[in-house]
Amino acid sequence: MLSADEKQLILHAWEKVHTHQEDFGAEALERMFTVYPQTKTYFHHFDLHHGSEQIRRHGKKVVVALENAVHHMDNLSAALCKLSDLHAYNLRVDPVNFKLLSHCFHVVLAGHLGEEYSPQVHVAYDKFLAAVSDVLAEKYR
Protein backbone atom coordinates (compact mmCIF):
# COMPACT_ATOMS: atom_id res chain seq x y z
CA MET A 1 0.00 0.00 0.00
CA LEU A 2 1.24 3.50 0.74
CA SER A 3 4.56 4.20 2.41
CA ALA A 4 4.83 6.73 5.22
CA ASP A 5 6.49 9.18 2.81
CA GLU A 6 3.68 8.77 0.27
CA LYS A 7 1.08 9.40 2.95
CA GLN A 8 2.86 12.62 3.88
CA LEU A 9 2.94 13.71 0.24
CA ILE A 10 -0.80 13.10 -0.04
CA LEU A 11 -1.57 14.98 3.17
CA HIS A 12 0.62 17.92 2.17
CA ALA A 13 -0.97 18.24 -1.29
CA TRP A 14 -4.43 17.84 0.23
CA GLU A 15 -3.98 21.10 2.13
CA LYS A 16 -4.47 22.90 -1.20
CA VAL A 17 -7.35 20.67 -2.28
CA HIS A 18 -9.19 21.23 0.99
CA THR A 19 -9.68 24.93 0.31
CA HIS A 20 -11.13 24.30 -3.18
CA GLN A 21 -13.31 21.23 -2.66
CA GLU A 22 -16.29 22.35 -4.72
CA ASP A 23 -14.17 23.72 -7.57
CA PHE A 24 -11.89 20.68 -7.86
CA GLY A 25 -14.78 18.23 -7.54
CA ALA A 26 -16.91 19.99 -10.14
CA GLU A 27 -13.98 20.23 -12.53
CA ALA A 28 -13.23 16.51 -12.17
CA LEU A 29 -16.88 15.61 -12.83
CA GLU A 30 -17.14 17.94 -15.82
CA ARG A 31 -13.96 16.43 -17.26
CA MET A 32 -15.33 12.93 -16.73
CA PHE A 33 -18.62 13.78 -18.46
CA THR A 34 -16.73 15.32 -21.40
CA VAL A 35 -14.07 12.64 -21.87
CA TYR A 36 -16.25 9.67 -20.90
CA PRO A 37 -19.79 10.68 -21.95
CA GLN A 38 -21.16 7.25 -21.02
CA THR A 39 -20.81 8.29 -17.37
CA LYS A 40 -23.62 10.82 -17.84
CA THR A 41 -26.18 8.00 -17.66
CA TYR A 42 -25.94 7.99 -13.86
CA PHE A 43 -26.72 11.71 -13.76
CA HIS A 44 -29.68 11.93 -16.13
CA HIS A 45 -31.53 14.03 -13.55
CA PHE A 46 -28.70 16.61 -13.31
CA ASP A 47 -28.16 19.80 -15.25
CA LEU A 48 -24.84 18.80 -16.82
CA HIS A 49 -23.90 22.21 -18.19
CA HIS A 50 -20.63 23.84 -17.15
CA GLY A 51 -20.97 25.49 -13.75
CA SER A 52 -24.23 23.73 -12.90
CA GLU A 53 -25.11 23.99 -9.22
CA GLN A 54 -25.92 20.25 -9.16
CA ILE A 55 -22.48 19.36 -10.49
CA ARG A 56 -20.81 21.75 -8.05
CA ARG A 57 -22.70 20.23 -5.09
CA HIS A 58 -21.97 16.67 -6.16
CA GLY A 59 -18.35 17.55 -6.88
CA LYS A 60 -18.01 18.82 -3.35
CA LYS A 61 -19.52 15.56 -2.03
CA VAL A 62 -16.93 13.61 -4.02
CA VAL A 63 -14.03 15.64 -2.65
CA VAL A 64 -15.40 15.52 0.92
CA ALA A 65 -15.51 11.71 0.60
CA LEU A 66 -11.93 11.73 -0.69
CA GLU A 67 -10.93 13.94 2.22
CA ASN A 68 -12.43 11.37 4.58
CA ALA A 69 -10.33 8.74 2.83
CA VAL A 70 -7.21 10.94 3.05
CA HIS A 71 -7.65 11.15 6.80
CA HIS A 72 -8.28 7.39 7.10
CA MET A 73 -5.69 6.01 4.68
CA ASP A 74 -4.93 3.14 7.04
CA ASN A 75 -8.54 1.92 7.07
CA LEU A 76 -10.18 2.86 3.79
CA SER A 77 -12.70 0.01 3.95
CA ALA A 78 -14.23 1.32 7.16
CA ALA A 79 -14.05 4.95 6.04
CA LEU A 80 -15.80 4.26 2.73
CA CYS A 81 -18.14 1.43 3.71
CA LYS A 82 -21.39 3.42 3.48
CA LEU A 83 -20.34 5.01 0.21
CA SER A 84 -19.43 1.62 -1.21
CA ASP A 85 -22.84 0.24 -0.20
CA LEU A 86 -24.64 3.22 -1.74
CA HIS A 87 -22.88 2.94 -5.08
CA ALA A 88 -23.12 -0.86 -5.30
CA TYR A 89 -26.61 -1.57 -3.97
CA ASN A 90 -28.63 1.60 -4.49
CA LEU A 91 -27.08 3.48 -7.39
CA ARG A 92 -25.61 0.41 -9.11
CA VAL A 93 -22.74 2.35 -10.59
CA ASP A 94 -20.42 0.38 -12.85
CA PRO A 95 -17.19 0.22 -10.81
CA VAL A 96 -15.05 1.14 -13.84
CA ASN A 97 -16.38 4.67 -13.37
CA PHE A 98 -14.41 5.06 -10.13
CA LYS A 99 -11.20 4.63 -12.11
CA LEU A 100 -12.39 7.08 -14.78
CA LEU A 101 -13.14 9.72 -12.16
CA SER A 102 -9.78 9.04 -10.50
CA HIS A 103 -8.04 9.75 -13.79
CA CYS A 104 -9.92 13.02 -14.16
CA PHE A 105 -9.04 13.97 -10.59
CA HIS A 106 -5.35 13.44 -11.43
CA VAL A 107 -5.71 15.93 -14.28
CA VAL A 108 -7.35 18.46 -11.95
CA LEU A 109 -4.60 18.02 -9.36
CA ALA A 110 -1.88 18.40 -11.96
CA GLY A 111 -3.50 21.51 -13.38
CA HIS A 112 -3.94 23.25 -10.06
CA LEU A 113 -0.88 22.09 -8.14
CA GLY A 114 1.53 22.68 -11.01
CA GLU A 115 5.13 21.89 -10.09
CA GLU A 116 4.00 20.70 -6.67
CA TYR A 117 2.36 17.76 -8.46
CA SER A 118 5.75 16.12 -8.81
CA PRO A 119 6.24 12.58 -10.13
CA GLN A 120 6.43 11.41 -6.49
CA VAL A 121 3.14 13.11 -5.60
CA HIS A 122 1.57 11.70 -8.77
CA VAL A 123 2.62 8.16 -7.85
CA ALA A 124 1.36 8.58 -4.29
CA TYR A 125 -2.02 9.86 -5.49
CA ASP A 126 -2.20 7.16 -8.14
CA LYS A 127 -1.79 4.47 -5.49
CA PHE A 128 -4.21 6.23 -3.15
CA LEU A 129 -6.95 6.75 -5.75
CA ALA A 130 -6.53 3.16 -6.99
CA ALA A 131 -7.02 1.95 -3.41
CA VAL A 132 -10.11 4.15 -3.02
CA SER A 133 -11.51 2.78 -6.30
CA ASP A 134 -10.83 -0.79 -5.17
CA VAL A 135 -12.60 -0.22 -1.85
CA LEU A 136 -15.60 1.35 -3.57
CA ALA A 137 -15.78 -1.70 -5.85
CA GLU A 138 -15.49 -4.28 -3.02
CA LYS A 139 -19.24 -4.81 -2.71
CA TYR A 140 -19.51 -5.84 -6.36
CA ARG A 141 -17.65 -9.10 -5.78
From Swiss-Prot:
| A biological process term (GO) from this entry | hydrogen peroxide catabolic process
Where does the source fall among the domains of life? Eukaryota
In the UniProt record, the signal sequence range is none
The answer, when asked if Iron is one of the entry's keywords, is yes
Gene Ontology molecular function: haptoglobin binding; heme binding; metal ion binding; organic acid binding; oxygen binding; oxygen carrier activity; peroxidase activity
Database matches in PROSITE patterns: GLOBIN
Q: Which InterPro entries match?
A: Globin, Globin-like_sf, Globin/Proto, Hemoglobin_a-typ, Hemoglobin_oxygen_transport
Please report which protein family the annotation says this sequence is part of.
Belongs to the globin family.
Protein name, please?
Hemoglobin subunit alpha-D
